[in-house]
A protein has these predicted regions:
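Active-site donor/metal-binding and catalytic loop motifs
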Residues: 170-192, 196-200, 211-217
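Short, well-formed alpha-helical segments that are part of the catalytic scaffolds
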Residues: 12-27
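Short, flexible, basic/aromatic active-site loop/helix in glycosyltransferases
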Residues: 106-131, 141
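Short aromatic/hydrophobic "clamp" motif used to bind/position activated sugar donors
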Residues: 58
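Conserved donor NDP-sugar-binding/catalytic core segment of glycosyltransferases
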Residues: 70-107
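A short, conserved alpha-helix in the catalytic core of glycosyltransferases
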Residues: 127-141, 148-175
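The conserved acidic donor/metal-binding loop of glycosyltransferases
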Residues: 62-66
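Glycine-rich, basic loop-to-helix element that forms the pyrophosphate-binding segment
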Residues: 39-53
Length: 271
């Protein structure tokens, strides 16, 4: 039996308690939630979580993510599929960018008012993840890069780290609610992370993240910032805000109950 824990780096009890902590699997005692506070970066927070927990499967989730009823059983089903496809898999995610640059999902995003991502028929190998939710197999022995700044692009970095070690990362049909706030434009902390990734993975560029293409020239950074400015009003109108209960969002997406009953459930969700 593989054991499961969910790790979250949170700086807001209000956001946490309105979203991730509302996920039924915690209230039902079917999974544990490990919290990290006051870390200077996502990498440091998540490495601390790895050191503080022992579960075979660690789910790194944002505090504004909601996991609908039965989500843990769907996770078990997806991991059984990827295990059958690649017994040495390292990472799995709810949303990622395929090797062909296709967006693999689906997830709900409140900031743009859409379900995003193509639903694949089987686990699909990816080059990057959206950081809203990343699943790691502890036996992969992966660690996050504590030299990486801030809170952006670590989903791309951990995938590239895995690939550099001969391991693979996948995304598949693992719905989640991302009750995220609208962001008007890329800020300086995002630019810092972009430059770091340019330097670190310069021999592997270009790389496509869910937000931007990382290229040697960096022209896509300037292009995206220009597009952000010119599309700000349109994108703001797409946002539904963050005041809707995540349970209601899950219901509207058709995800109120994701319970599935795999024949061989090897994931112990009681730990």
């Amino acid at each position: 039996m593989m054991t499961l824990t969910v790790a979250c780096a949170s700086n807001s009890d209000i956001i946490l308690n309105a979203n991730l902590a509302q996920s039924p699997m915690f209230a039902d005692g079917r999974a544990t939630l490990h919290l990290e506070r006051d870390a200077p970066s996502a990498a440091i927070a998540y490495n601390r979580a790895l050191d503080a927990t022992t579960a075979d499967i660690v789910v790194f989730a944002h505090h504004d993510v909601y996991l609908p009823k039965g989500w843990e059983t769907m996770l078990a089903a997806r991991l059984a599929e990827v295990q059958a496809q690649d017994p040495n898999w390292a990472l799995f995610g709810s949303f990622g960018v395929g090797l062909d640059a296709a967006h693999i999902g689906p997830v709900w995003s409140s900031s743009i008012g859409l379900i995003v991502g193509r639903v694949p028929m089987q686990p699909t190998e990816v080059q990057s993840f959206d950081e809203l939710l990343i699943v790691m197999r502890r036996a992969s022995n992966l660690r996050f890069d504590e030299g990486a700044p801030g809170w952006h692009m670590y989903g791309t970095d951990i995938v590239q780290t895995a690939r550099s070690q001969g391991l693979r990362a996948y995304a598949g049909a693992l719905p989640a609610i991302h009750n995220d706030r609208y962001h008007e434009a890329l800020q300086s902390d995002f630019v810092e992370c972009y430059r770091y990734m340019q330097r670190k993975w310069r021999t592997d560029l270009p790389l496509r993240t869910p937000i931007i293409k990382i290229s040697r020239s960096g022209l896509h950074l300037y292009r995206n910032r220009w597009l952000d400015r010119t599309s700000a009003r349109f994108r703001a109108n797409m946002s539904v805000g963050v005041d809707h209960p995540p349970q209601r969002l899950a219901e509207l997406c058709g995800w109120a109950d994701l319970t599935v009953y795999p024949k061989n459930n090897s994931l112990d969700v009681s730990n």
